[in-house]
Amino acid sequence: MYVLDTGFDALLARAWLADHASETIEVQYFIWSTDNIGILASEALLRAAERGVQVRVIVDDLTVEAPDKFLLALAKHPNVGIRIYNPKHSVGTPRHKRALNIATDFRGVNQRMHDKTFIVDGKVAITGGRNMADEYFDYNSEYNFRDRDALLVGQATKDMRATFERFWTSPLSVDVETLYAGRGLLNKNVEV
């Protein structure tokens, strides 16, 4: 185990691992912003996918900030899969349905996925308190969280990958293309 104490070290480790992945990258985050960090992370994953790496992403629905076109463009890449955990708040959900979900299914709406994992080739992983947003990597000019991550190898990585797989196959994790398929957005102005 190696502790990634600073935002710079944590970002650099993720970037290096993404650039050196040869088979798979599996990531799970509660928050994925469309700020500097979110864009850098998305670009790193897309570069890996372009090299033939299979990329799978799970993000909690409550805090996805990415526009529809952004999510769909990434998901259209043949080597990228994006699933949204418990999609009742934002992704692919019309506004009137969001309000109805909150009013009639508070328990179901409140079930969240708070994991933060970055697993490369099933051999190396990063986990900790950082979400994919500027304020978790010391990039916010007004406020930054003080978080740490751990870089892991060995059995801990295998256990994290098994947990990722359980979330990936959960009925609560829905493919982003499925969420948009019925709304006419799937092929509208989306190019990779």
Regions found by a protein language model. Give the residues of each.
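HKD-type phospholipase D/PLD-like phosphodiesterase module
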Residues: M1-A21, I31-V192
